[in-house]
Amino acid sequence: MGGQLKVFAGQSNPDLALSICNSIGIDPGLIEYVCFSNENIKVKICENVRGCDVFFIQTSCPSVSDNLMELLIALDALKYASAGRITAVLPYYPYALADSKDEPRISVASRLMADLIAEAGADRILTMTLHSPQIMGFSRIPVDQLSGVPTICAHYAELGVDNAVVAAP
């Protein structure tokens, strides 16, 4: 897509979105959220996105379900506002650990998330290193995963730490 670049943010982490926008030298997109008394939400895109290359940033921090619904409704609003291409930027992929059926009668929620995000209007998903590479195969749209390892290694090398050990679950 050759459309103008626009970045919008969900309410889960506005500071992250502002930092990203500042680093690439653009203003965040204008978006309005209304929460009704019954806890339903409305998302309004407050500028023209027709034909634009849109990135929507939303983290899956608590409240995961609320942030997920906000993401889906925002993607749908962008789709119906005729955005040229929509990339869902998800620093932490929702339900990433639910990537297999390890007991009977349970959902593979990670696959469901891929379906919902694509159906809502995303053309691509951009996320950080996934728990399991099979998650990329769940999606019918492209999934790009970025790694933080080079940045972390460079940071500790700059500090002069020679034999650091990193442990993670």
Regions found by a protein language model. Give the residues of each.
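PRPP-associated nucleotide enzymes
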Residues: M1-P169
